[in-house]
């Protein structure tokens, strides 16, 4: 029978400490464990319970209390955890394959560092920009993550020929796997076929009348409140969510008509801000989904989404919408699995969210810049006046040929990218060369779009709104191919043309009828200061005044 003294022998604690080190070296040092965090916690709980049982049986003749037994076993468990933690920290600090890349020392140790910076003001894109100014083109912002603004990186990471895959962040919604979150290249290519049909030129022509109808509703609201300040970003959100609600679920949210936010929009904005702030801690999402109270909004949202999809499956719209193509692909399956059904709901969510948040952001930032730059706005209005003089009714094909309108849209998207912190990728196991720099395999890499788009090496006067850089002053853009607001390659934005259609319709219909100005001189400053990084760019209030044009 073991004595009590034996259990406090330092050799026993050393044994468990070494066990923790070996657990890191041979298990956790390899692969992705983010989705298994709950199982890992369960494993340590089982370890603790087993140790309590073993120690109890071993010293039962000595009549120790449960408290003392638990204390002994907990010390063993803590020794294991200490070994694990110290091994992780030492490895990340001095032995990790990314040790030669510059960056804050704390970023080497844990993703908590970059998460803290993200939470400070919800403006991670500015935090990363500051890091690049200090450390250069390639910055280690996490234990296994690099942020890169080297121009060579764009095609190396995102082109069709890139060997990179999507990073761990794309698993945060597990088990939901919308098209955007699909990491397997073959599966993504297969599922994307239905989406390509949904956004083909033929399909877009069928959506055009509905987009025009919602644009008219938006203009009517501006007409009703002209010459008085309105929150333009709020109304642009109403517009984009109404459009995508129609195209995703076969029925609108009626926010333009009612002038009030639908709970769906509020849930989306709340969830996106949380997701953006915690994007570098993918392991925390499985925990949040399982913890009562903390998962309440998620459960409400998923319940509401299920109701919408169930209703849409039973009610075919008179006119085809985006979801018609996705649903047709689902119905073609011989025996849809439970995962197929979950993915269908994820795709419905993707249609409604991806096309609404980004379009609202594009419109808000565009009109903010036009209000600040009246000469630019006047030049655009001249182009639109000529267009409307030659066309009885606007259509997307002809609107897409307006050079200055597109230049203003492009310049706005350059300064205020819809996904300011960029898209996560994972290098292939064999690694990847970026220019003259070798990136080790299985490394998380991101091009921070906001910082990249404001790089003076790529764009002269990079922080200024100059639409002419895309038309008459092309020398201000060193290489136009570095501007990819909808990304490139097989993962590029499938809804690009629909988003542009909405933006072009709204800008052309409003500016041909109204002048736009800031409600007061601090609006532009407050707007830029209020932008937030919620994976997509989240909009603050934008108080604008629209007045009827007299000429």
Curated annotation (Swiss-Prot):
InterPro entries to which the protein is assigned, alphabetical: Cyt_P450, Cyt_P450_E_grp-I, Cyt_P450_sf, Cytochrome_P450_monoxygenase
Organism: Fusarium pseudograminearum (strain CS3096)
Function according to Swiss-Prot or TrEMBL: Cytochrome P450 monooxygenase; part of the gene cluster that mediates the biosynthesis of cytokinins such as fusatin, fusatinic acids or 8-oxofusatin, known for their growth promoting and anti-senescence activities toward host plants. FCK1 is a bifunctional enzyme that performs the first steps in the biosynthesis of Fusarium cytokinins. It first condenses adenosine monophosphate (AMP) with dimethylallyl diphosphate (DMAPP) to yield isoprenyl adenosine monophosphate. It then catalyzes the removal of the phosphoribose to produce isopentenylaldehyde.
Enzyme class name: oxidoreductase
Organismal lineage: Eukaryota, Fungi, Dikarya, Ascomycota, Pezizomycotina
Gene label: FCK2
Classification via Pfam families: p450
Induction: Expressed during infection of barley and Brachypodium.
GO CC aspect terms: membrane
Protein name as annotated: Cytochrome P450 monooxygenase FCK2
This protein's pathway: Secondary metabolite biosynthesis
UniProt key word Heme: yes
Record: residues binding heme: 493
UniProt-annotated glycosylation sites, renumbered to this chain: 258
Family the UniProt entry places it in: Belongs to the cytochrome P450 family.
Disruption phenotype: Results in the production of only two cytokinins, isopentenylaldehyde and 8-oxo-isopentenyladenine.
GO molecular function, one term: monooxygenase activity
UniProt topology in membrane: Multi-pass membrane protein
Transmembrane spans: 8-28, 35-55, 69-89
Cofactor(s) needed by this chain: heme
């Amino acid at each position: 029978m073991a004595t009590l003294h034996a259990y406090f022998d330092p050799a026993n604690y050393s044994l468990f400490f070494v066990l923790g080190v070996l657990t890191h070296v041979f298990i956790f040092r390899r692969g992705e464990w983010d989705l298994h965090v709950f199982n890992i916690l369960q494993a340590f709980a089982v370890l603790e319970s087993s140790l309590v049982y073993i120690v109890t049986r071993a010293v039962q003749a000595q009549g120790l209390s449960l408290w003392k037994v638990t204390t002994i076993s907990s010390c063993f468990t803590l020794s294991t955890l200490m070994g694990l933690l110290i091994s992780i920290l030492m490895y990340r600090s001095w032995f990790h394959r990314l040790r030669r890349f510059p960056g804050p020392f704390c970023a080497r140790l844990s993703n908590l560092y970059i998460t803290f910076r993200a939470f400070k003001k919800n403006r991670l894109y500015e935090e990363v920009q500051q890091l690049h100014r200090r450390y250069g083109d390639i910055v280690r912002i996490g234990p296994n993550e690099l942020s890169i603004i080297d121009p060579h990186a764009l095609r190396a990471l995102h082109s069709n020929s890139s060997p990179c895959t999507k990073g761990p962040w794309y698993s945060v919604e597990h088990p939901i796997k919308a098209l955007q979150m699909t990491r397997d290249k073959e599966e993504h290519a297969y599922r994307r076929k239905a989406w390509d049909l949904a956004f083909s030129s033929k399909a877009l022509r069928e959506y055009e009348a509905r987009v025009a109808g919602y644009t008219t509703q938006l203009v009517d609201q501006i007409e009703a409140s002209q010459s008085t300040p309105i929150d333009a970003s709020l109304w642009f959100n109403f517009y984009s969510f109404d459009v995508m609600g129609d195209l995703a679920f076969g029925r609108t949210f009626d926010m333009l008509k009612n002038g009030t936010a639908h709970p769906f929009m509020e849930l989306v904005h709340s969830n996106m801000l949380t997701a953006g702030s915690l994007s570098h801690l993918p392991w925390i999402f499985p925990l949040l989904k399982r913890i009562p109270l903390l998962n309440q909004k998620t459960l409400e949202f998923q319940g509401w989404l299920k109701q919408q999809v169930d209703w849409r499956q039973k009610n075919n719209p008179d006119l085809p919408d985006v979801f018609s193509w996705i649903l047709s692909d689902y119905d073609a399956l011989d025996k849809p699995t439970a995962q197929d059904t979950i993915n269908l709901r994820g795709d419905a969510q993707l249609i409604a969210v991806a096309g609404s948040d980004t379009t609202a952001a594009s419109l808000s930032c565009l009109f903010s810049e036009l209000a600040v730059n009246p000469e630019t706005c006047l030049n655009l209005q001249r182009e639109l006046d000529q267009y409307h003089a030659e066309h009885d009714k606007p259509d997307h094909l002809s609107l897409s040929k307006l050079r200055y309108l597109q230049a203003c849209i492009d310049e706005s998207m350059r300064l205020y990218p819809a996904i300011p912190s960029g898209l996560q990728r994972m290098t292939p196991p064999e690694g990847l060369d970026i220019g003259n720099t070798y990136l080790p395999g299985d490394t998380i890499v991101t091009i921070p779009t906001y910082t990249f788009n404001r790089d003076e090496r790529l764009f002269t006067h990079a922080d200024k709104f100059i639409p002419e850089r895309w038309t008459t002053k092309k020398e201000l853009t060193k290489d136009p191919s570095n501007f990819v607001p909808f990304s490139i390659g097989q993962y590029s934005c499938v809804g690009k043309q629909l988003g542009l259609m909405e933006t072009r319709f709204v800008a052309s219909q409003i500016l041909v009828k109204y002048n736009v100005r800031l409600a007061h001189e601090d609006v532009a400053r407050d707007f830029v200061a209020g932008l937030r990084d919620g994976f997509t760019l989240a909009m603050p209030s934008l108080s604008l005044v629209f007045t009827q044009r007299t000429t």
